[in-house]
């Protein structure tokens, strides 16, 4: 039987969140989604996130491969399980819940 190990606060390996945001560049809802996502990530994830933006107007293959038919759409790629949020991400509590940040941080 293994002994449980105690880890000092701040020394755990921090999980990086990989996010993919599908947008239609120049569209208002896509701009709002980008701003809302950046705000949420800055507040809750600090330096522990990477956002890949995909403009569906110039990259046709990626949205089809990922089954994206509406913009803006956010996909949580990692940590698994994958999650998808559609819309301009103005429902902050909904986005936090979908990204499973509520379990990590008090809101």
PLM feature spans:
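Structured alpha-helical
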Residues: 12, 51-54, 65, 77-79
